[in-house]
UniProtKB/Swiss-Prot annotation:
UniProt cofactor(s): heme
Source species taxonomy: Eukaryota, Metazoa, Chordata, Craniata, Vertebrata
Compartments it resides in: Endoplasmic reticulum membrane; Microsome membrane
Any Pfam family matching the protein: p450
Keywords, alphabetical: Endoplasmic reticulum, Heme, Iron, Membrane, Metal-binding, Microsome, Monooxygenase, Oxidoreductase
Protein name listed in UniProt: Cytochrome P450 2F5
GO cellular-component term (any): cytoplasm
Function in brief: Cytochromes P450 are a group of heme-thiolate monooxygenases. In liver microsomes, this enzyme is involved in an NADPH-dependent electron transport pathway. It oxidizes a variety of structurally unrelated compounds, including steroids, fatty acids, and xenobiotics.
Record bears the keyword Endoplasmic reticulum: yes
Annotated family: Belongs to the cytochrome P450 family.
Length: 491
């Protein structure tokens, strides 16, 4: 790019930023926050390497609700259980909008289920929840699919023969296969190139979007579209996944029997045919591709990441691991695999899984929200369309809700009688209207996978347990555990 083109680009960017800044002052009474600079906003106060820590630090100065400017974009930040709960639960309708998250929106254009709004989002969410809840229609249940995949995973883990290995890839393949089974109707062999492609592109995108490059792209997408860097791979990866999904949809169309749907794609295609004559229908081919992509992305990365954190925590605290195994032996034994019916009789195991999710805090800022109308909230007036960041890390680490929030402590989810105790501040799947629709599936996977693995193996670190580092490698879109290896000792 020559100097004239560069100058024109910078001038256009400056004008856009100025217009956005001026338009953000039109109405409303926003909470106080640091004074923004022209164009840059408050970026000089924020560490691009760790936006989460910077925003959390500002909440200690400005309180549980403050305004910050990410470049020209005005954002209201909510921290702590009470503020987040009042917004997402008590005033859930007003805070149910989804911001145009650039890394996704520039690909989906607001289509699909994760980043759509209004009637389209409500219709797609209701349809998807119904399909996931009633999946199978007389055929195999989701639990059966998880148990089947768990058996393949255990067989793969036995091949390690006690030698050190990195669990990332094997867990990703297995977890991804479950959502693939729901979406596409069947699992893939672990060496199937389609499965490997899905995992490769999703993992790469999750890491990029959790990096400084991803955070900068979120703030200045128009500028960074012209800048070389790893963020450019995001859309290449998305396109490859879209092409893979489109190929599967084409195969489904050729063999579709509306009376006997095999999977999510079949159900969606049938709905498309039913509403083909309705000009207001939200069921179109592009919507199918984007919704399938959203579910595939959401169902692959977060569960695998949580399981890796669980491995680290159980190796760092071997007494916790031993107590979980003792409960498994008592309730389930060794003659069969654990089942969902066992969970109610295993309060300590349930508490450990919840504590892993709280402590790991995989999606610490949730996905970005937006108010759907002018909203009176805590004495302020938030104008329609204002972006909202909910710091879920401050919910999961709120000392008013958890006795020792900075420590890994399963007792947070146990009462005085050692029975499982729910916490209203447990929000790894967010809360309110935008609660993750895959919550039930993810909870099933975490319980069935972790108990099956600990029934068969003990997790052994390569070094001293006290030296295991549980601090995340990235704190952007997601908290990622540091790379590690472990050994599995058959029990």
């Amino acid at each position: 790019m020559d100097s004239v083109s560069t100058a024109i680009l910078l001038l256009l960017l400056a004008l856009i930023c100025l217009l956005l800044t001026l338009s953000s002052r039109d109405k409303g009474k926003l909470p106080p926050g640091p004074r923004p600079l022209p164009l840059l906003g408050n970026l000089l106060l924020l560490r691009s390497q760790d936006m989460l820590t910077s925003l959390t630090k500002l909440s200690k100065e400005y309180g549980s609700m403050y305004t910050v400017h990410l470049g020209p974009r005005r954002v209201v930040v909510l921290s702590g259980y009470q503020a987040v709960k009042e917004a997402l639960v008590d005033q859930g309708e007003e805070f149910s909008g989804r911001r145009d998250f650039p890394a996704f929106f520039n690909f989906t254009k607001g289509n699909g289920i994760a980043f759509s709004n209004g009637d389209r989002w409500k219709v797609l969410r209701r349809f998807s929840i119904q399909i996931l809840r009633n999946f199978g229609m007389g055929k195999r249940s989701i639990e059966e699919r998880i148990l089947e995949e768990g058996s393949f995973l255990l067989a793969e883990l036995r091949k390690t023969e006690g030698e050190p290995f990195d669990p990332t890839f094997v867990l990703s393949r297995s977890v991804s296969n479950i959502i693939c089974s729901v979406l596409f109707g069947s699992r893939f062999d672990y060496d199937d190139e389609r499965l490997l492609t899905i995992i490769r592109h999703i993992n790469d995108n999750f890491q990029i979007m959790s990096s400084p490059w991803g955070e900068l792209y979120d703030i200045f997408p128009s500028l960074l579209d012209w800048v070389p860097g790893p963020h450019q791979r995001i859309f290449q990866n998305f396109k490859c996944l879209r092409d893979l999904i489109a190929h599967s949809v084409h195969d489904h169309q050729a063999s579709l029997d509306p009376r006997s749907p095999r999977d999510f794609i079949d159900c969606f295609l049938t709905k498309m045919a039913e509403e083909n004559e309705d000009p207001l229908s939200h069921f179109h081919m592009d919507t199918l591709l984007m919704t399938t992509h959203n579910l595939l992305f959401g169902g692959t990365e977060t569960v695998g990441t949580t399981l890796r954190y669980a491995f680290l925590a159980l190796m760092k605290y071997p007494k916790v691991q031993a107590r979980v195994q003792e409960e498994i032996d008592l309730v389930v034994g060794r003659a069969r695999l654990p089942a969902l019916k066992d969970r109610a009789a295993m309060p300590y195991t349930d508490a450990v899984i919840h504590e892993v999710q709280r402590f790991a805090d995989i999606i610490p800022m949730s996905l970005p929200h937006r108010v759907t109308r002018d909203t009176a909230f805590r004495g302020f007036l938030i104008p329609k369309g204002t972006d909202i960041i909910t710091l879920l890390n401050t919910v999961h680490y709120d000392p008013s809700q958890f006795l020792t929030p900075q420590e890994f402590n399963p007792e947070h989810f146990l009462d005085a009688n050692q029975s499982f105790k729910k916490s209203p501040a447990f929000m790894p799947f967010s809360a309110g209207r935008r609660l993750c629709l895959g919550e039930s599936l993810a909870r099933m996977e975490l319980f069935l996978y972790l108990t099956a693995i600990l029934q068969s193996f003990s997790l052994q670190p390569l070094g001293a347990p006290k030296d295991i580092d549980l601090t995340p490698l990235s704190s952007g879109l997601g908290n990622l555990p540091r790379p590690f290896q472990l050994c599995l000792r058959p029990r």
